[in-house]
Amino acid sequence: MEEEYESRRLRRWEELDTDILVRIFQKFSVFELTSGLAHVCRGWRAACCDPILWKTVDLSNMRSSFIKIPLEPYVYVERRSDEALTRILKLSMNLSGGSTRTLIFHFNLFLSDDQLTYTAERCPGLRRVVLPAWNRIKKTGICKAIRIWKDLESLTMPSIANPPYLLTEIAKNCKNFKELKIMGPFEVFFANTLITCLPNIKTLSIRCSAIKREALMKILDGLPSLEVLNISHSHLVEYSGWQPQQKVIVRELDKTIMEKTARLKKFLTCMDHKTCVMCQRTENDEGIVRWYKYEEGDWKVDEVSSLHL
């Protein structure tokens, strides 16, 4: 009798209330959710497809297996690693049913154009994208994705040499865009493009970077809607005299800059290179922080709460 009761009780796992299953599955990572749970039974698949589980697809702990190469795209990704990413993306997108609003990738997870396009087409309602590695993504790939993401509000991206093509697409297609984080040096060209294309941006983070002083001055003058600016652990760069090679690192903000930042709701800065570890790392790495050398997860940090992972 006891064995019969136990057998009946175990069989009822498939009848467990969907709401309870969803609460349990909320504790699981995307890797666990795509590991076969949906194939246990129809009830479990229904729970696995609940939109609340897929509001954020977080792949910030998944890295590509790659080697650096001297020519573009400067990385070669192992086939098995690429296949693993494709599998995760396909399963996630199938289960999410287009409900994903936030998509997060590791800074050493190198998507191809095909992977990016596939993902963009299956989650057109994205509002936030964290995509720090663009080595294998071409202009056509990212522009196609931006055209799909009409509701995009926030983007974390690497510093790029030719920003107009991207920021122009954002301006044309993403009317609610308000938040940008740049990982890497911030040049005058980028600042000018930002002012031209996205003058109404509200939040900008360029932490742990080398920032041209002229570029900083331009955004303070040219972004009238800017409310939050984060330059924590960054240093300013100037060039003295007539020789561009004579680079000067500025470790203190002068009166002119402080006066211009006074209008902001929040101005976040730290330039204490003597005692601050992150300031020291930025300077040692010459404004392009080698995140792989440091504690896992450091790259996710941001003093702006809406950008922190």
Curated annotation (Swiss-Prot):
CDD domains: F-box_ScDIA2-like. One of its GO terms (molecular function) is SCF ubiquitin ligase complex binding. This is F-box/LRR-repeat protein At3g48880. It holds the Pfam family F-box-like. InterPro entries: F-box-like_dom_sf, F-box_dom, LRR_dom_sf. Residues 10-57 form the F-box domain. LRR repeats lie at residues 77-107, 108-133, 159-184, 208-233. GO terms for biological process: defense response to Gram-negative bacterium. PANTHER family: F-BOX DOMAIN CONTAINING PROTEIN, EXPRESSED. The keyword Metal-binding does not apply. Coiled coil: none annotated. Keywords: Leucine-rich repeat, Repeat.
